[in-house]
C-alpha cells in the first residue's frame, strides 16, 4: 500500500511550491471530487494538495497517513481559523511554517509561544523553499509519521522495505539540501564568532557580556531556522547550559581586550558548533556529547586569528 500525504492550508502558504521542491513533480489529476484537490504522485508516497481557502472546511481524509498543515511565516500572524485548525490536529500532522527566511528573532519567539501551546515541538517544522532550509527535517519527520501510521493500520507492513524505498527516493535530495544547510549554518557561526570578537573590544569590565549573550542567542535562532527546528528560550538555555558556555564566567577574569577577544570568539564558535550538531541530529544528542563538541570547537577556534 502506497501511503498518502495530505497538504492543506491557505492559498498563500506556498503549498504547491513546497511539494514540488520536495518531490520534483507536478500534479497529475484530481484525486477527489472535492474542488481543487490535486494529486502529486511519486513511487513511495502520493501527495494530495487541498486548495480550499477556508481552513475550517478542509476535509482531511481518513486515509491520509500524514498531514502537512502549512501556515505562512511571511504573514504577521496566523488567523483564528488557522489556530482552531491547529488545535484539532492529531499525531499524523506537522505544522509547517513556510517562508521561514522572512522571520526575525522576535517573530519566531512570538510564533513559537503560540504554536508550542497547541502542538509538540516535534510537530513544528520551519521551512524555506528558496533557501532549502528545514527540508531534511520535514522529510525525516514525515517518514517517521507515515511509518507509524502504516504500522498501526496494517499487520503486513514491513518497515525495512518502506525505509529502503523512501531512502532511495529521497537520498539525493537530502544530500543536496543537507550540504546547503551546512554551508549556511557554518557561515552563521563564523559571522557570529567574528561579531563576538568585535564586541569584545569594549575595554570596560563586563560591559560587553550582554551584547555577547544576545549575539549567541541570535546565532542559535538562525541555526535552528536552518534546520527547521521550533526554537524557544527553553531550548536555547538548554544548549548554552549543556555547553558550559557562560561568557560571564569566561570573561570575568579577562578585562583586557586582547585577552577577551579570542575568548569571546572561541566560546561563541564552540556554542555554534554544538548547536549545529544538536539540530542536525534532530535534537537527539545528549549533554555530554554537546559539551564535548563545544570544547573541541572552542579549542580549534582559539588558534584562529580573530
Locations of regions flagged by a protein language model:
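Conserved G1/Walker A P-loop phosphate-binding module
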Residues: 1-50, 221, 227-230, 273-275, ...
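Conserved beta-strand scaffold positions in the cores of enzyme catalytic domains, especially
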Residues: 39, 47, 123-126, 201
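Conserved C-terminal guanine-recognition region of P-loop GTPase G domains, centered on the G4
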Residues: 55-123
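Canonical P-loop GTPase G-domain recognition
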Residues: 101-157
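C-terminal helical "lid" subdomain and adjoining coupling/linker elements of P-loop NTPases
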Residues: 144-176, 180, 283
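Basic/polar, acidic-poor N-terminal "presequence/leader" segments
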Residues: 170-197
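Membrane-inserting effector segments that mediate pore formation, membrane fusion
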Residues: 189-274
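Charge-biased C-terminal accessory regions appended to nucleic-acid-, cytoskeletal NTPase
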Residues: 262-306
Amino acid at each position: 500500500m502506497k501511503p498518502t500525504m495530505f497538504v492543506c492550508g491557505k492559498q498563500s502558504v506556498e503549498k504547491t511550491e513546497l511539494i514540488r521542491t520536495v518531490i520534483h513533480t507536478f500534479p497529475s489529476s484530481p484525486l477527489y471530487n472535492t474542488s481543487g484537490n490535486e494529486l502529486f504522485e511519486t513511487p513511495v508516497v502520493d501527495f494530495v494538495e487541498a486548495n480550499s481557502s477556508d481552513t475550517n472546511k478542509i476535509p482531511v481524509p481518513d486515509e491520509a497517513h500524514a498531514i502537512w498543515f502549512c501556515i505562512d511565516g511571511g504573514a504577521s500572524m496566523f488567523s483564528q481559523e488557522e489556530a482552531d485548525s491547529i488545535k484539532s490536529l492529531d499525531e499524523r500532522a506537522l505544522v509547517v511554517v513556510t517562508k521561514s527566511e522572512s522571520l526575525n528573532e522576535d517573530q519566531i519567539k512570538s510564533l513559537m509561544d503560540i504554536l508550542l501551546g497547541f502542538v509538540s515541538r516535534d510537530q513544528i517544522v520551519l521551512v524555506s523553499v528558496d533557501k532549502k532550509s528545514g527540508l531534511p527535517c520535514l522529510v525525516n519527520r514525515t517518514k517517521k509519521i507515515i511509518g507509524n501510521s502504516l504500522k498501526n493500520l496494517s499487520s503486513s507492513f514491513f518497515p525495512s522495505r518502506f525505509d529502503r524505498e523512501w531512502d532511495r527516493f529521497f537520498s539525493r535530495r537530502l544530500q543536496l539540501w543537507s550540504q546547503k544547510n551546512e554551508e549556511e549554518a557554518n557561515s552563521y557561526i563564523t559571522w557570529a564568532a567574528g561579531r563576538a570578537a568585535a564586541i569584545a573590544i569594549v575595554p570596560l569590565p563586563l560591559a560587553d557580556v550582554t551584547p555577547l549573550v544576545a549575539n549567541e542567542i541570535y546565532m542559535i535562532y538562525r541555526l535552528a531556522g536552518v534546520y527547521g527546528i521550533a526554537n524557544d528560550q527553553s531550548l536555547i538555555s538548554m544548549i548554552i547550559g549543556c555547553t558550559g558556555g557562560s561568557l560571564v564566567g569566561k570573561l570575568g577574569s579577562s578585562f583586557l581586550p586582547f585577552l577577551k577577544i579570542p575568548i569571546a570568539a572561541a566560546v561563541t564558535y564552540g556554542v555554534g558548533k554544538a548547536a549545529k550538531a544538536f539540530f542536525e541530529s534532530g535534537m537527539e544528542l545528549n549533554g555530554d556529547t554537546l559539551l564535548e563538541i563545544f570544547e573541541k570547537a572552542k579549542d580549534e577556534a582559539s588558534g584562529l586569528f580573530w
